[in-house]
Each structure stands twice: as structure tokens, then as C-alpha cells.
């Protein structure tokens, strides 16, 4: 059975962005492009209505590319259960209150039984301290917490 993965907006942005001269960003872009075909071949891949909203912002041509890139993936709606869990993640200081969208990405994935959240957002999602806090909050609410990782980490896992 395929693993259920959730693509957060930063991953889409790296996939569709023009090649960067910054070595770190270029490495992220390369890992994302290497992972992209596997998202439909090896995984049940999901995005949310929030990813659609975020991907549609900014330069119209780039927004169109981002929206086109995520079109093959299944979309998860944002429901009251996800909104409530996102509020609890923020209240528990798992995600800073200035970034409610990040808490909502996690909550949508959690309430829909997603196994892995893929993101390049190391500041508020994919760092050890956030992962520990979020896991504690989510599990205290009676849910199973998905793993949060970068595209590079998922590639190295080889699943």
C-alpha cells in the first residue's frame, strides 16, 4: 500500500522556481525535481485547499505554474476539525501564532491520516523543536502525528 504524503507549499515553489545560483537553494530545487515524479508513481500525494490558495498568490505566470504542478494531486478540504486542531497547535506553542497557516498545514494532514508532511519550511515546520512540540500536542489530542521531512530526507529514505 502506498504511503500517504502531503506536499506543503514551499515544495511546490522550489519545484517551479527558476534555477537559483545560491548553492543551497539550487540543491533544494534539485532534490525537489528528483522527488516530483515519485510523488505520483510511489505515493498517494495530497495537497490542501490552503496549498492551492498559497500557490495561487504572487506573479500570475509563476502562480499558474505552481497550480499546474499540483493539479495531479488529491486535494484535502479544510474542515472545522482541522481548524480546531490548528488552534490547539498554536495555543500549545507548537507553531508561532504569527504563522497560523503552518499550523493549518499540519492539522489538515493530521485529521486526514497523512503519514508524511513534506516541506522546505525549516523555520516553523521541519526542525527538531517544532516537531517535538507538535507531536506532543497532536498526540495529546488523540491523533497520530505524521512525520515531517524535507524532499531530500524522503529521497534518502528510498521508500
Language model: regions and residue ranges:
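C-terminal end-helix/capping segment
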Residues: 125-147
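A structural signal for short, well-ordered beta-strand segments and their strand-loop junctions
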Residues: 6-7, 46-48, 117-119, 150
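A general structural signal for short secondary-structure junctions and capping/turn motifs
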Residues: 36-38, 107-108, 138-140
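Active-site neighborhoods of divalent-metal-dependent phosphate/nucleic-acid chemistry enzymes
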Residues: 73-133, 155
Amino acid at each position: 500500500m502506498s504511503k500517504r504524503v502531503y506536499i506543503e507549499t514551499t515544495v511546490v515553489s522550489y519545484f517551479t522556481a527558476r534555477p537559483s545560483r545560491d548553492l543551497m537553494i539550487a540543491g533544494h530545487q534539485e532534490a525537489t525535481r528528483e522527488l516530483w515524479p515519485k510523488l505520483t508513481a510511489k505515493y498517494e500525494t495530497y495537497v490542501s485547499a490552503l496549498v492551492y490558495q498559497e500557490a495561487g498568490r504572487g506573479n500570475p505566470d509563476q502562480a499558474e505554474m505552481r497550480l499546474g504542478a499540483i493539479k495531479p494531486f488529491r486535494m484535502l478540504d479544510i474542515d472545522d476539525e482541522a481548524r480546531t486542531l490548528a488552534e490547539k497547535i498554536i495555543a500549545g506553542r507548537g507553531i508561532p501564532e504569527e504563522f497560523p497557516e503552518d499550523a493549518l498545514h499540519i492539522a489538515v494532514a493530521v485529521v486526514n491520516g497523512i503519514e508524511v508532511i513534506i516541506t522546505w519550511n525549516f523555520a516553523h515546520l521541519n526542525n527538531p523543536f517544532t516537531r517535538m512540540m507538535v507531536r506532543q500536542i497532536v498526540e495529546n489530542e488523540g491523533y497520530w502525528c505524521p512525520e515531517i521531512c524535507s524532499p531530500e530526507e524522503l529521497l534518502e529514505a528510498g521508500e
